[in-house]
């Protein structure tokens, strides 16, 4: 039997936030996020010929997930040091989580043309987005910057009752396992180096060079064992003009998941590459910000 899996779709996020500085160098903020999107998954199962030489009967399954959810966040930030030479910032955020109740439409087809529906139904799944606590610190000098974050996610809480079972392999190599949601902890660290942001002669010295590392666990356990996952990142920030903090950001990421228990349980070890490009617009305080939205005046 040959299996072929395919999938496509996307989830879009819109976020609105509001910040307030009640005391000098101390800020609080709130935010609301709305998610929506559709994800389609298809599998094709093609067995060996059973109705005659060269003739096959294939089975096709299609799942469509329609997602919609809203959740909120609060956060605080304290600039312990803030001057022209150094910045030291501490921060924390709390995410309230929310209910993610996807509408799932499942269809099963059989036959070479996949036009005979043998089973089809629509259900609503119950899945809770986790509450999340994140704390971090950031330190910056003229050339160097380093940041550290710790993130805790409460996946196990209200999702603890959702357990699944599965098998891998066959015959003597067949392995049964139980899958359950679990709380996760992740540590992140990144460093940035900018040789000289104000260098007028050497363009590459104005670039920012970045590297990072992330280590944690997946949000599901297999027979009580957690899937470890980690990633390494690298990137550059290309300033839009000399002395500017606004930049075009380019980054790559390589990650692995499940390498610690995949072989023992007969699971697939996952590895991936990501490429990202973005734009950072910096419009800070008047004394050190960039005047993107002010009309120039000439004497």
Regions found by a protein language model. Give the residues of each.
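Outer-membrane beta-barrel porins/channels
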Residues: 1-299
